Amino acid sequence: MENETHYAEAVIDNGSFGTRTIRFETGRLAKQAAGSAVAYLDDDTMVLSATTASKKPKENLDFFPLTVDVEERMYAAGKIPGSFFRREGRPSEDAILTCRLIDRPLRPSFKKGLRNEIQVVATIMALNPDHLYDVVAINAASASTQLAGLPFSGPIGGVRVALINGQWVAFPTHTELEDAVFDMVVAGRALEDGDVAIMMVEAEATEKTIQLVAGGAEAPTEEVVAAGLDAAKPFIKVLCKAQADLAAKAAKPTGEFPVFLDYQDDVLEALTAAVKSELSQALTIAGKQDREAELDRVKEIAAEKLLPQFEGREKEISAAYRSLTKSLVRERVIKDKVRIDGRGVTDIRTLAAEVEAIPRVHGSALFERGETQILGVTTLNMLRMEQQLDTLSPVTRKRYMHNYNFPPYSVGETGRVGSPKRREIGHGALAERAIVPVLPTREEFPYAIRQVSEALGSNGSTSMGSVCASTMSLLNAGVPLKAPVAGIAMGLISQEINGETHYVALTDILGAEDAFGDMDFKVAGTKEFVTALQLDTKLDGIPASVLAAALKQARDARLHILDVMMEAIDTPDEMSPNAPRIITVKIPVDKIGEVIGPKGKMINQIQEDTGAEITIEDDGTIYIGAQVGSQAEAARATINGIANPTMPEVGERYLGTVVKTTTFGAFVSLLPGKDGLLHISQIRKLAGGKRVENVEDVLGVGAKVQVEIAEIDSRGKLSLIPVVEGEGDDEKKDDTDK
């Protein structure tokens, strides 16, 4: 019985876009894991997930030790890793972002107080190059965890839906996404009443959104995004049912796991009696550092009062203090509509925006919202400097690279600095997705763009601050964005009063409000539509009307922030003199060889002569980059002379260069690749009419000589005559007399 393989299937109906089948299987692979499941997408993409738990809890931890790892195996796409050792190394950015997509809905679904180490490892074993594996991995991870006998309130269904030709399509392919206006990953649980509790959303507009909207497609406004969340619910329900069917056949009974509650009720009651009034007072201080100093002081008073009574329970006192703080903050918001720093629920903190914040760089901007301070810095370079990707994705290069740094001093602490953590990679990716839809195309702006966001101060949503700083920095660097983008972080607090749930949406949340709220979501966009959205909630479903109102509230805030940013910069600046100048030239594909020359001789010569860097694409597009515009233009003129020549005509005059001498004359280069013969009989004119025995006596290689084309024969060979000083003027005079 133990070796029996069990299956369950979820069929997703996309109407005119056909069906997708997600098949779950357990009992065949990874049998020693507490729970293992394989998820197949159309029997072509395969993800194995294994969930294991430590035998003993880590009692000294004050958090739940859940680890999610995604292992991309290059054999899944029939590739050998491109690294020196030809072996997979550290996880790719795609893998790290998928880890976060799995962790976010899974973590809150475990029983509160669980302290056993839980590890979920999802391995991508087979991948159709047109499929996206991330949502398949969410479902596989949920299924394996559901089977593992853990205190887990799943299953969780994850689906990607994209708005294509006015229809929300589930599990779209890469090919289908090329026509999508909006793309979102939604994860949630099926509730007993038949509804779906949405737990996580990760969404973005696409590179083609603006082009598609201009062509008549529906813009991804807040209303459209809310409709997309509703469209995802039936798909999530089908996925949850398939996982539940599998669990009914093969799940282990839930084991006995010790739960370490943060505190007992007696500690909370004693703490409330001892310091509630002082704590309430401390929570009205507007400044973050002053408030935290006072909160620490009140916490010390609480410890002094309670420790004699609760000896050895210091951790409980600390946890109860956090819980009391949370309830007081929430109560004040619900009842008085007043927040920690004294703002109303829709108020935005003081904004400041400036460009050219640091010297010499190609573009920079400083954006401040309250105590959150972000420096955005833009660097431009040749397209050959774009990021080369060696992943399972069919995308092999990335022209816009957004890096986010969060140093410990941004919150006044010490800590490790160095390689980016998962959180930094996630925040950078969110800011990148917010900006990508408004970037100019490669043809319009042939540059690789690296954008760095430095979080210099943090108190609430540095990722959305990064979007604002990046927009201004890119404009300062001269990048012609299609529209400016701003972002805002929102929170939601709910409380039941007299049997009715009241919801309050908060605009521009602080770090503390993020921790104490029921939902936080970040929205970035232009004046017209949403470009990126990230949502996490602890609630079992948010009424559609509440979500719609919160999205509208976010839009109002975004428009206000855009106005402030536009006062600092509203159009692209002139490019920095320190930025390279890049121009393009298109040549016939059959001329590429001529431009390169034998063994690269011609292209190397052009680069050496002009100081420009040249990159040639297979379609005949040539990118020419140089530190000075005149160098790039010189290279373009030379390339055009070779590959797009204007055919010389009889009577045209050129200042040519002697490239070779023979016994019968000199070959003179007029244009790159165009030489003509100046016969020895014509060279006599340059020697005052005297007989010339040796061409070298009059013209050496490298000499400049003014010539005129006298004849072009049937094979295109050019015969030249010299233009002797004074001769040309006399001829013109004679013509006039005639």
UniProtKB/Swiss-Prot annotation:
SMART domains, per database record: KH, S1
Domain KH residue range list: 580-639
Cellular localisation: Cytoplasm
Keyword terms of this UniProt record: Cytoplasm, Magnesium, Metal-binding, Nucleotidyltransferase, RNA-binding, Transferase
GO BP term (any one): mRNA catabolic process
Every S1 motif domain range: 651-723
Residues the entry annotates as binding Mg(2+): 514, 520
Enzyme kind, highest EC tier: transferase
Coiled coil: none
Enzyme Commission code: 2.7.7.8
Pfam families: KH_1 (PF00013), PNPase (PF03726), RNase_PH (PF01138), RNase_PH_C (PF03725), S1 (PF00575)
Annotated Gene Ontology cellular component terms: cytosol
Domain of life: Bacteria
Any one GO MF annotation of this record: polyribonucleotide nucleotidyltransferase activity
Function, in words: Involved in mRNA degradation. Catalyzes the phosphorolysis of single-stranded polyribonucleotides processively in the 3'- to 5'-direction.
UniProt similarity note: Belongs to the polyribonucleotide nucleotidyltransferase family.
Database matches in PANTHER family: POLYRIBONUCLEOTIDE NUCLEOTIDYLTRANSFERASE (PTHR11252), POLYRIBONUCLEOTIDE NUCLEOTIDYLTRANSFERASE 1, MITOCHONDRIAL (PTHR11252:SF0)
HAMAP family, alphabetized: PNPase
Name the record gives this protein: Polyribonucleotide nucleotidyltransferase
The organism of origin for this protein: Streptomyces avermitilis (strain ATCC 31267 / DSM 46492 / JCM 5070 / NBRC 14893 / NCIMB 12804 / NRRL 8165 / MA-4680)
